[in-house]
Amino acid sequence: MDITNRQAVLKNFLGNSPDWYKLAIMGFLIINPLVFFFVSPFVAGWMLVIEFIFTLAMALKCYPLQPGGLLAIQAVAIGMTSPHQVAEEIANNLEVLLLLVFMVAGIYFMKQLLLFVFTKLLLNIRSKTILSLAFCLASAFLSAFLDALTVIAVVISVSVGFYTIYHNVTSNHSDKDITDDSGIDNQDSHETLEQFRAFLRSLMMHAGVGTALGGVMTMVGEPQNLIIAKSAGWNFADFFIRMLPVTLPVFIFGLLVCLLVEKFKLFGYGAQLPERVRQVLTEYDQQANAKRTKQEKMKLIVQAIIGVWLVLALHLAEVGLVGLSVIILATSFCGITNEHSLGKAFQEALPFTALLTVFFAVVAVIIEQSLFTPIIQFVLQASPSAQLSLFYLFNGLLSSVSDNVFVGTVYINEARSAFEHGIVSLQQFELLAVAINTGTNLPSVATPNGQAAFLFLLTSALAPLIRLSYGRMVYMALPYTLVMTIVGLLGVEFLLVPMTEWLTQAGWISLPHITNGVAIPH
């Protein structure tokens, strides 16, 4: 049956997304300019933030790049922000974009080694509780020295590998796309696959939270940590020690949550690795070991050496540049010289890189319209004793709906400005820096918006395979969110001041001399 031009345009608009979703996006595009010009730019700015969060929440209905991008283009077009401000935000976050483009692609060329190591881990640790703890601890440790996005990229790569191996076997070795379950013809296989999905979901969430537990501890764990450390004049050791009064209790309780949710099967956790899947992975491992040639063994050794280089080099150059060196070294010594083979490595990260660039446009609107200014002013007007908790809570709240790099940067700049103008003392500024860092890193696990690693997981090729939606991520993160936020708040409120004083008296902390530029330690 023929359709009209209007119907054809509507069908093409956002493709196979539900009609109600298409109407919602069109509604946003109509309402936003009206509110901006006739009601209030401030209200329109907050509406844009909420609408962008909505597109992220509906990531499984439609990839957020298209609807979010349309909203961002309109925001620039009507004057909510300027192309210059967007370009400035992109320039400020160039490290993160380079990380996504090159580091994630670099990890792709180390997949053989990662699959080899994690298959051994998965098959040798039969207790799901201990395995979950191992994933959480490994992610926390790696995130203290690597960027959380890199760690998540590793775990995603491994999980896709596991899923592909089992899916190919259970769908009768079909060469079809692994997103297509039509080759699985009996009920038992479907149930096993669903259980395997639940198993992978729980491991991914434990690993994701692990990146937050480890990432908050060191100045290289998250991009905003570097900004905060630079502003306060702390080196690697200073930063680690100053954070300990808050981060150590949170780390311990975070691991406790990991054990409890697995043991009592709470919040979607507790799914075991199905025995059928274990058999398939064991057979795959045995066959792979038997077939492995000397050439392939040398590839694994080369990839292991490159892995060591990856960890050591992160302190020598920008993360993205290290990622580029990983691509060059891995492809050179593993014999990958075909352009088509190289291109596959970039497929996973580039859509998310584009989405993150759109996100920076939304951040530019937040800056241009001063959406966070009333909250910041309210916090700075509070008494010094209340400031720490308020900074922590408002940082956490705003980081859950915005980019934690942006929130951390805005707050540390405001705190630094308050110190330079004599509103807060040096000691108070340093305590505020701890509250800001922990506030941006801990409560932000509540939603994928707050943590770039969570957002990357949500929009990755793995999420639809294991049925990991925005809502499910929020639900599964809830026990961690509550415990980490509350323990962090108690640490800021009751432990931070006395422990910092004790560490200073014990000689573990030296007071920096802060100039008008950058803080410089004695």
Swiss-Prot record:
Domain of life: Bacteria
GO CC terms in record: plasma membrane
GO molecular function: sodium:proton antiporter activity
Membrane topology according to the record: Multi-pass membrane protein
Keyword tags: Antiport, Cell inner membrane, Cell membrane, Ion transport, Membrane, Sodium, Sodium transport, Transmembrane, Transmembrane helix, Transport
Pfam families listed in its UniProt record: NhaB (PF06450)
Transmembrane intervals: 13-33, 98-118, 140-160, 239-259, 304-324, 356-376, 390-410, 446-466, 477-497
Reactions accelerated catalytically: 2 Na(+)(in) + 3 H(+)(out) = 2 Na(+)(out) + 3 H(+)(in)
Localization (cell): Cell inner membrane
Keyword Lipid biosynthesis among UniProt keywords: no
Presence of the UniProt keyword Transport in the record: yes
UniProt xrefs under InterPro entries: Na+/H+_antiporter_NhaB
Homology family: Belongs to the NhaB Na(+)/H(+) (TC 2.A.34) antiporter family.
Role: Na(+)/H(+) antiporter that extrudes sodium in exchange for external protons.
UniProt protein name: Na(+)/H(+) antiporter NhaB
